[in-house]
Amino acid sequence: MIRVELVAPDYIYQVWDDVKDYLDASIKTGTNTCTLDQLKLLLAKNYQTLIVGVNEYNVIKGAMTVEIINYPNARTLFITALGGIGVVTSEIWQQVEDWAKLQGVTKISAWCEEAQARLYKQKAGFNTIRFVVEKDL
């Protein structure tokens, strides 16, 4: 079974080699809002949080980065990157949701491609709420 653990900002540099490939895959399919090195800095400065999935041998099998955003009507846990092996399961999501509730979070959201959206729906009970369009200027 995979258990979810938070990585304190002080330990980002110690675990970085174990998580960077998981996060890089997600960053590369993103919208170029940040690079992998920039994400590392955001984590180290505590602007975002690193959550890891660890197996029974304490081996990191996946990683997720999140940012808590306060909107007028919701406190949202926004997933900025996610990757790993077997880390999108209902058991793992329940652990993430339990932690998020302790932080006062009322919603979890993520930007993702269509295939990723299907996985979020199937494994974690997400709903497609809106489509994001973008144009570079």
Model segments located where?
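Terminal substrate-recognition subdomain of acyl/acetyltransferases
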Residues: 1, 5-12, 111-137
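Short amphipathic alpha-helix that is part of the acyltransferase structural core
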Residues: 1-34
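Ordered hydrophobic segments in well-structured contexts
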Residues: 3, 20, 48-52, 62-65, ...
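Active-site rim helix/loop that mediates acceptor-substrate recognition in acyltransferases
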Residues: 29-48
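Short, flexible, glycine/charge-rich loop motifs used to bind or transfer phosphoryl groups or to couple energy/partner
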Residues: 40-41, 67-69, 98
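Conserved donor-binding loop and adjoining core beta-sheet/short helix segment
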Residues: 45-87
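Solvent-exposed, well-ordered amphipathic alpha-helical segments
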Residues: 53-61, 93-97, 119-126, 135-137
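Acyl-donor binding region in acyl/amide transferases
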Residues: 74-123
